[in-house]
Structure formats: structure tokens, C-alpha cells
């Protein structure tokens, strides 16, 4: 069972999303935290053997340079270069934000004008099932990036052997649903507590994505950087009875 992921429009689109979660001026965000989230996100995609295009890797190398500069002793010349690199990055994100807002405004105007013209009905085209990167799904990936990093560290400390067992997404979907039996919701990180190796962690996550795609599960996150909870999607009849 394959799960395809649509990319962001580019690395700046991903960075803008990460920055916007802080709900403050772009130039005031903790840039080191943003860099770590970006690198963790890309690392997770690679661990899941999903394609990461070259432009994301180029940006990753630039971000690692900025991060490494911040770890160096505070020498005047180095500090100036570090500030230049950081300000240049933030300026790129700010410029991208403005262009994106302009694009959204123009698209809204286009849709408004389109309402004045009748259009012939178009045949609906269905592609292979894809999980689109909406904001909630992006936050899910970011949360999983942190979980995967912590589990890798845990396995390393416990000298856990990486087994070559073939975990099936279909089997893991059953496990995910069973984990919700008798409870209203499940905190995302609690789903992976009993996982024995990285492959099991990743397959559990893919199973979760599949259940979200098939609308058997929904995500709840009440605030930026808050815990993400999984909930079974109730049928309308169940909602009416509750």
C-alpha cells in the first residue's frame, strides 16, 4: 500500500509554515528552532524513503551552515557573517510571504469574476489517492519528526537491534484502531510507546496516515506546538446519539 505526499510549493513554503506557527514577526522568531524543525522534517521524509527534491536539500545545507555558525565561539567576523546569513534567510521568507499573499488575493479575485460566467460542467478526474499537505497534516509530520528522533535515541541507548521484519500497513491500521478502543482520543506519542524498532515506528505512522486519508481518524491540535490527539471519526448517527 503506497501513500503519496504532495510537496510544498518549495522549501520557502515549508519554512514559512514553520515560522507562522510562532505567530510573531518573522524577524523575531527563534531561527535555530525553525532550522531544527526543517531538518527534522526532511530527515523524516528520508527515513520513510519518500522522495526529497534537490531544492529542499540545498536549503537544508544552507540551514545547517547557519546552525553551525551559531555554535561557533562569538568572534566578531563570524558573528557578522552569521547575522548576514540569518537576515538573508528571513528576508527570503518575508518576501515569499508577501508574494504568496498577493497570489492568494489574485486567485480570490479570479474566483469572484468566474462566478459571473456560466461554465459547462466538467467531467471529474480522479487521480491515485494522495494525502494532501494541509496544515494539520503538516503539523502531524512535524510532531512525528520529533517522535522518530526520540525513538531513535531511545533505541540507540538501549542497544536495540534493528530487525528486518516486514511490517504491513494493513496490520498496523488494526493496531492503531485497537489502541483507541475504549477511549475518546489518543495522544500521538503514546501510540509509539511499545514500538520495538524504527521500522515499526514508521509503519505505525504510515498506518495512521492511511486511516486519516480514509477518514476513519481525525486529528485534534488545540494550539500551535501543542499535543496532537487521534480520534475516531464518528458517524452522523453516533454524533446525534452522543
Swiss-Prot record:
Keywords: Cell cycle, Cell division, Chromosome partition, Cytoplasm. It comes from the Bacteria. The keyword Protease does not apply. It is found in: Cytoplasm. One of its GO terms (biological process) is cell division. Pfam families: SMC_ScpA. Gene3D superfamilies: 6.10.250.2410, Structural maintenance of chromosome 1. Chain E (1.10.10.580). GO terms for cellular component: cytoplasm. Participates in chromosomal partition during cell division. May act via the formation of a condensin-like complex containing Smc and ScpB that pull DNA away from mid-cell into both cell halves. Belongs to the ScpA family. Component of a cohesin-like complex composed of ScpA, ScpB and the Smc homodimer, in which ScpA and ScpB bind to the head domain of Smc. The presence of the three proteins is required for the association of the complex with DNA. PANTHER family: SEGREGATION AND CONDENSATION PROTEIN A. This is Segregation and condensation protein A. The lineage of its organism: Bacteria, Bacillati, Bacillota, Bacilli, Lactobacillales.
Amino acid at each position: 500500500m503506497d501513500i503519496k505526499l504532495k510537496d510544498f510549493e518549495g522549501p520557502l513554503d515549508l519554512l514559512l509554515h514553520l515560522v507562522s506557527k510562532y505567530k510573531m514577526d518573522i524577524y523575531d522568531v527563534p531561527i535555530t528552532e525553525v532550522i531544527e524543525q526543517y531538518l527534522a522534517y526532511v530527515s523524516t521524509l528520508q527515513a520513510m524513503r519518500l522522495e526529497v527534491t534537490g531544492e529542499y536539500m540545498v536549503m537544508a545545507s544552507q540551514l545547517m551552515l547557519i546552525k553551525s555558525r551559531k555554535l561557533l565561539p562569538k568572534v566578531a567576523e563570524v558573528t557578522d557573517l552569521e547575522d548576514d546569513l540569518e537576515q538573508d534567510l528571513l528576508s527570503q521568507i518575508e518576501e515569499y510571504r508577501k508574494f504568496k499573499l498577493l497570489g492568494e488575493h489574485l486567485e480570490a479575485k479570479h474566483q469572484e469574476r468566474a462566478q459571473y460566467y456560466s461554465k459547462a460542467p466538467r467531467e471529474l478526474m480522479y487521480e491515485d489517492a494522495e494525502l494532501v499537505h494541509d496544515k494539520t497534516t503538516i503539523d502531524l509530520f512535524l510532531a512525528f519528526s520529533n517522535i522518530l528522533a526520540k525513538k531513535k535515541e531511545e533505541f540507540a541507548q538501549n542497544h536495540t537491534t534493528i530487525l528486518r521484519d516486514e511490517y504491513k500497513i494493513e496490520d498496523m491500521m488494526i493496531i492503531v484502531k485497537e489502541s483507541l478502543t475504549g477511549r475518546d482520543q489518543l495522544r500521538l506519542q503514546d501510540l509509539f510507546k511499545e514500538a520495538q524498532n524504527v521500522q515499526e515506528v514508521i509503519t505505525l505512522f504510515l498506518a495512521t496516515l492511511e486511516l486519516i486519508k480514509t477518514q476513519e481518524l481525525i486529528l485534534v491540535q488545540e494550539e500551535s506546538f501543542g499535543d496532537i490527539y487521534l480520534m475516531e471519526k464518528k458517524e452522523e448517527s453516533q454524533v446525534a446519539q452522543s
